[in-house]
Amino acid sequence: MAAPSPSTLTASLMAAKKAKGLSFADLEVALGLDEVWIASLFYGQATASPEEAEKLATLLGLDPAITAALQEFPTKGSLDPVIPTDPLIYRFYEIMQVYGMPLKDVIQEKFGDGIMSAIDFTLDVDKVEDPKGDRVKVTMCGKFLPYKKW
C-alpha cells in the first residue's frame, strides 16, 4: 500500500481527532507530548517514534498506513512558498515583515552572529486572559547556534 500524501495524512488525522471529540490539548495529556508538537505531526512536519505512533493510532483508531506514515521522515517547511492567505498564518508573516530585522538585530546584540535553532526548539501557545480581550502568548525557545569561522 502506498503511503498517504501529506494532505491525505493531515485530513485523516484531523477527521479522527474530530470524530473522537479531542483537542490537541487532550492529546498532549494522553500522549505526554506538547500540543504544538502533536499539531506539527498532524501537518507532516514531525516524526513519531513507533511507540508514539502506536499510542496515537490506538487513541484515534488509525489504520496501519496512517500509523506507518507518522514514522516517516517528512520534508519539513514544505508549505506553499506564496504569501499565506489564512488570516492567522498571515499575521505571523506580517510580524516577521515588521519585526524580523529588529528581532534579528536584538538577538545578535545579545548572542553574537548566529541563528536560533528550529531543531533544538520548543514552541508554546498560551491564553492570557485580559479584561480588554484575551491575548495570545506565543513563546519560542531555540538553542543559539553561532556561525563557525574557518
From Swiss-Prot:
A Pfam family: Cyanate_lyase
Presence of keyword Lyase: yes
InterPro entries tied to this protein: Cro/C1-type_HTH, Cyanase, Cyanate_lyase_C, Cyanate_lyase_C_sf, CYNS_N, Lambda_DNA-bd_dom_sf
Record GO terms (molecular function): cyanate hydratase activity; DNA binding
Reaction equations catalysed: cyanate + hydrogencarbonate + 3 H(+) = NH4(+) + 2 CO2
Broad EC category: lyase
Positions of the catalytic residues: R91, E94, S117
EC number(s) on file: 4.2.1.104
Keyword entries, A-Z: Lyase
GO biological process: cyanate metabolic process
Domain of life: Bacteria
Stored NCBIfam families: cynS, PRK02866.1
Family: Belongs to the cyanase family.
Function statement: Catalyzes the reaction of cyanate with bicarbonate to produce ammonia and carbon dioxide.
Name of the protein this chain belongs to: Cyanate hydratase
